[in-house]
């Protein structure tokens, strides 16, 4: 039930291990920190990490007459979360499902969750281009979707997979809002200098080639890693960090596209 959702943003990645779920989670927290009501939907059925990243493991979801009730992280209901991780008894339990069952579950997530009034719904998808992605895109035809943010890393192999993701978006008719290059350098925890430990500028070159915006480059920052397992936003806890600056810029970019006001 997305009738109360103003904007839907899909977060994609060409391959696993690029930090897509971390970017999705921190983007949702950044949007909330700037005054928006946000939903975060984790449809990575085989590797749901959002409950862990937000410290929500062990929470139970319930059904009401209108569908599943998402997990709220605060009494004001400014951040609502839904993930298959809440349906698993143990985080280490594998999800061994064939395609049709995965498709059915994703459709349920997109149609049977009772989202309240939301400014943004962030959808964290599995890596690659699979049945799950096709299901999401088919469901999005019935609901206005603003577009996709693609997360990559500077390495060549990751960029090759992003090219496939861009082609997928083009063929399925979803607009690419921009590219985020994650793990772009390492921030020293002692002096705060950033050192490029992988290739550099790959995300910028790919964005230029695809003629889409480069939304920002996020470094590996150990201080950000410490926030995992909580609902603390980088914008509040590390306000002067380069990660916070990039996330703030992405929020402003999205608000500019959707004409939603951002609070200070």
UniProtKB/Swiss-Prot annotation:
GO MF annotation: an example: metal ion binding
Cofactor(s) demanded: [4Fe-4S] cluster
Binding of [4Fe-4S] cluster, residues: 188, 191
Binding site for ATP: 14-21
CC annotations in GO: cytosol
An annotated GO BP: iron-sulfur cluster assembly
Domain of life of the organism encoding this protein: Eukaryota
DNA-binding is among the record's keywords: no
Subcellular location: Cytoplasm
A Pfam cross-reference name: ParA
SUPFAM superfamilies: P-loop containing nucleoside triphosphate hydrolases
Keyword Nucleotide-binding (UniProt): yes
Cofactor annotation remark: Binds 4 [4Fe-4S] clusters per heterotetramer. Contains two stable clusters in the N-termini of Nubp1 and two labile, bridging clusters between subunits of the Nubp1-Nubp2 heterotetramer.
Keywords for the protein's UniProt record, in alphabetical order: 4Fe-4S, ATP-binding, Cytoplasm, Iron, Iron-sulfur, Metal-binding, Nucleotide-binding
Similarity annotation: Belongs to the Mrp/NBP35 ATP-binding proteins family. NUBP2/CFD1 subfamily.
Role according to the record: Component of the cytosolic iron-sulfur (Fe/S) protein assembly (CIA) machinery. Required for maturation of extramitochondrial Fe-S proteins. The Nubp1-Nubp2 heterotetramer forms a Fe-S scaffold complex, mediating the de novo assembly of an Fe-S cluster and its transfer to target apoproteins.
Quaternary structure annotation from Swiss-Prot or TrEMBL: Heterotetramer of 2 Nubp1 and 2 Nubp2 chains.
HAMAP family membership: Mrp_NBP35, NUBP2
Protein name (database record): Cytosolic Fe-S cluster assembly factor Nubp2 homolog
Originating species: Drosophila mojavensis (Fruit fly)
Protein encoded by which gene: Nubp2
